[in-house]
Amino acid sequence: KPDVTKQVGKPWGGLGLRVDVRGFQWNNPQARDAIFWEYSIANVSDYDLRDVAFGYWVDNGIGNDNADDIGYFDAEIDMSYSWDINGVGSGGLPTGIMGFAYLESPGLAYDYQDNDGDGLTDEKRDNEPTAIIGATEGITDLSSFLEFYKLEVEDLKEHWDADEDQDWQDGEDLNGDGIYQLAEYYGDDIGIDGVGPGELNYNGPDADGSECNHMPDFVEGVGCEPNFNTTDVSESDMVGLTSFRMFPVPSHAASNETEWFKNDQVMWNLVGGDTLEEFEGNISNLVEVFASGPFPLFQGRVERISMSELHSYDPLAGLNSGTHAAPALYELKRIVQVIYEKDYRFAQPPKMPTI
């Protein structure tokens, strides 16, 4: 497709995927030990891709002392982590933990199943709001929904149909002039630029009328209001972690049987298979495979996937125990998940009052 990509002097090849990648890191005390990675994967080919998987093939080499690494996974929070079994790296320096976690894994919005166990079936992050529906409409398993989102029945409310998890908040235009004043609560109804009155870079109501229109707004590739579609990870029916493997670094030979990333069929079997296995072999130089799938990627569609690279120090006694306890790492995962779901809006001091 020369109208999409140009490879000078070479024919078009490959799957026809366009991948945008962004990495984020902050010096905020809550998140300075984590790196956020966002992937936007678009199918720009002429075909539907029925089975796709996304994952990492990693030669960890913790502490540059790679002969004694080990790792573990937790499918409930979509995280894996590895460490040096004696906690000593090159030059005798202490080593920590390196973890990978899905903050947002691929979504399966067309299989008529509740893949993430939140009581919703086939929720999406790109559907348009069409009507306000009842408090329990759209929920397939009420008890699972309440447990997953930590809600009570009385917390449920009438909501826009495309806001499946009911967290988009309308504003209160008290004087009815169609514009939120600083003294009025604007909630999430701040327009697709994502900036509300009194916030940095606010230049007035959105020209397209999406601010103060009392409905969630989203335009693909342009913007979105908070807690809706692209800014609300919970509105995806996520597959989660489906494949975790660790094995000794294989031969570099270009064999169709070697577990090496240059061998397509072998790699598909690794990342596309539903295989979650704890490594119980001899401690050595190990490769880690961490993946999610399969999922369909239809022509013209975009799949959003977000990862976090996590680092912590946890006691070796817990790591090398049967439970592989890593409390500091688990707490960091909890924190970065909240940060991601709040669209990287860290805790801030109160706004300066107007006198």
Functional labels for PLM-detected ranges:
Residues K1-I355:
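Extracellular/surface-associated beta-sandwich interaction domains
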